[in-house]
Regions:
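Loop-centered beta-sheet repeat module
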Residues: 154-213
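Short glycine/acidic-enriched loop and turn motifs that connect beta-strands
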Residues: 15-19, 64-68, 106-109, 164-166, ...
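Structural preference for solvent-exposed beta-strand-turn elements
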Residues: 8-10, 15, 83-85, 92-95, ...
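Beta-rich, blade/repeat-based domains predominating
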Residues: 45-56, 86-99, 131-154, 187-202, ...
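Short loop/turn segments immediately following beta-strands, especially the blade-tip
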Residues: 27-34, 113-122, 171-177, 218-225, ...
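A short beta-strand motif characteristic of beta-propeller blades
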Residues: 37-43, 79-84, 126, 133-138, ...
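Blade-loop segments of beta-propeller domains
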Residues: 37-97
Length: 342
């Protein structure tokens, strides 16, 4: 949401102690200075750790075990709706109406819900699960779905699975709901893929691997995805198995990845065939779980989970360079940032 000289953002949080958060927070960015101001919280919700918005409203979930009450939640003004999630520790969701998909990290399955014409969740349509594991005995003894993405130009759902070192591509028909696994992209053993972003043509994909702290480029060839190359996120630094968020600039020239253990944002030039590392910038906090590029591409905001702050960076759209403004906003355990729609 934009007012004169200000842009507003929703902040997803963890609410379990010692966090002081109670749900979804909101802040305002001064687009002249980069100053951040805490606004009134939006809703009280336990562990709303990921958010997304559409023209219909705001969507989140409670990240917890299904026996504790994991649920999908929808908010539009004073209206709200919720549905139980048949999965453990949901961590990501995506929407392509009339479908909404949730990645359940703990149980490894993906829950697909139907939305009505006004965006309200109606019920569960499909439950997707592919068994698998990886060599990391602490993190990969079973599947861990970490992200879901509906492709814009095809009827396909992409699932990134950290536990099985794979990216799964499902073909689907919305009416009636029918999902079929069309490709499993096997990534290097122990890489632990977390999130993926696509270029606008959906011909190239960039996968951030949490466990190996690498960036893997996928290219589409004759309707199949192939690994093109792999690059370390940070040069000359010890791998600490904690890479997190990834964002591609609108002009598809620059790519940003957060490295939580090293407290850095890694910047890549992806204008060519091979990503080129340009910089690694300190996040001005501790454990950068998420970050977002503003719609005008002039700002980058970072959610530092362990230092309980959101920090603003000024961004040069031509060079991709980000520069800390010196402003931050205190929020307990911030883990997701989404720009509020107009």
């Amino acid at each position: 949401m934009t007012t004169t000289g200000h842009v507003h953002f929703y902040i997803g949080t963890y609410t379990n102690p010692p966090s002081t958060s109670t749900g979804i927070a909101r802040l305002s960015l001064n687009t002249e200075t980069g100053e951040l101001t805490r606004l009134d919280d939006v809703v009280v919700q336990r562990n709303p750790s990921y958010l997304t918005t559409t023209e219909h409203g705001l969507y989140t979930f409670s990240e917890m075990d299904r026996n504790e009450g994991a649920e999908l939640a929808f908010f539009r003004g004073s209206e709200s709706a919720s549905l139980p999630i048949n999965g453990d520790y949901p961590c990501h969701l995506d929407i392509k109406e009339p479908l909404l998909a949730v990645a359940n990290y703990g149980s490894g399955n993906v829950s697909v819900f139907q939305l009505d014409r006004d965006g309200k969740p109606l019920g569960l349509l499909a439950d997707l699960y592919v068994d698998g594991c990886g060599p990391n005995l602490e993190r990969q003894t079973s599947p861990h779905a970490h992200q879901v993405t509906f492709l814009k130009h095809s009827h396909q759902l992409v699932v990134v699975d950290l536990g099985s070192d794979s990216v799964l591509i499902y073909d689907y028909d919305a009416q009636p709901p029918d999902f079929s696994l069309s490709q499993v992209i096997h990534l290097p053993a122990g890489s632990g893929p977390r999130h993926v972003v696509f270029n606008q043509q959906e011909s190239t994909a960039y996968v951030v691997c949490e466990l190996s702290e690498t960036l893997i480029v996928l290219v589409k060839h004759q309707d199949k995805w192939l690994i093109s190359n792999q690059t370390e996120l940070l040069e000359g630094e010890e791998n600490q198995q904690a890479a997190a968020a990834i964002r591609l600039s609108q002009d598809e020239t620059f790519l940003y990845v957060s490295c939580r253990a090293q407290n850095k944002i890694s910047v890549f030039d992806v204008s060519g065939d091979t990503p080129k590392r340009r910089a690694a910038i300190h996040c001005e906090g501790v454990f950068p779980r998420d970050f977002v590029l503003s719609h005008d591409q002039k700002w980058l905001l970072v959610a530092n989970q362990h230092s309980n702050n959101v920090v603003s960076f000024r961004r040069n759209p031509q060079t991709g360079e980000i520069t800390a403004t010196g402003y931050d906003c205190e929020i307990g355990s911030p883990v997701c940032i989404v720009e509020q729609p107009l």
